[in-house]
């Protein structure tokens, strides 16, 4: 995911910032607890295509890193 693109993309619902989950190939809106898929390198920013993240379980945005 291009960092410049990530800077301008926002959640289509709340217009808040998104975080990139490299392992899952998703863009995460923490405010709405939604994950938007990235297919063939293209973010799919359609609400109907988003999945809800598990409530109370944080999405690991940096897999493999030591906290």
Swiss-Prot record:
HAMAP family from the UniProt entry: UPF0434 (MF_01187)
Source taxonomy: Bacteria, Pseudomonadati, Pseudomonadota, Betaproteobacteria, Burkholderiales
GO cellular component labels: cytosol
Pfam families: Trm112p
Organism of provenance: Paraburkholderia phymatum (strain DSM 17167 / CIP 108236 / LMG 21445 / STM815) (Burkholderia phymatum)
Name the record gives this protein: UPF0434 protein Bphy_0537
Chain segments annotated as transmembrane: none
Entry similarity comment: Belongs to the UPF0434 family.
